[in-house]
């Protein structure tokens, strides 16, 4: 991958990212897809990049590596999901946070999300800043 392509990708995703890892019962897959679509449409209107992933397998590829499904105690009846929200910079992240808190649609979406994740669990969240390496 050339430097110009890498730079273009990096500029497109910004320098700040929030990640959310959570377990969803397989029976809630379609409802969670719909919820992520609704949330994504709203949050993209705030100018962020929102990506959603589902874990493909639960096998560790080699000794010394633990699959995330094991780390968060996912069962065979559950899927492991990952959501990433990219912001241009910390100021943009703060601005989006204010918009989310003031958006009346967010409360019901949050409530629905808590009903869809595995009972007794929630979201594992991390806020990251990109390192320039």
What spans do the regions from the language model cover?
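Glycine-rich beta-strand-turn "strand-cap" elements at beta-sheet edges
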Residues: 1-13, 44-76, 101-133
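Generic intrinsically disordered, low-complexity segments enriched for polar/acidic and small residues
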Residues: 17-19, 36, 84, 120, ...
């Amino acid at each position: 991958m050339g430097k110009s392509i890498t730079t273009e990708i990096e500029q497109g995703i910004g320098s700040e990212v929030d990640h959310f890892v959570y377990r969803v019962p397989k029976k809630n897959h379609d409802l969670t897809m719909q919820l992520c679509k609704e949330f994504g449409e709203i949050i993209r209107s705030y100018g962020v990049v929102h990506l959603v992933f589902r874990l493909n397998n639960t096998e560790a590829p080699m000794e010394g590596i633990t699959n995330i499904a094991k780390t968060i105690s996912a069962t065979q009846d559950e899927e492991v999901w990952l959501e990433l929200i990219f912001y241009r910079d910390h100021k943009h992240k703060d601005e989006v946070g204010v918009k989310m808190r003031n958006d009346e649609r967010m409360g019901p979406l949050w409530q629905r999300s808590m009903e869809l994740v595995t009972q007794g669990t929630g979201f594992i969240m991390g806020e990251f800043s990109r390192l320039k390496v």
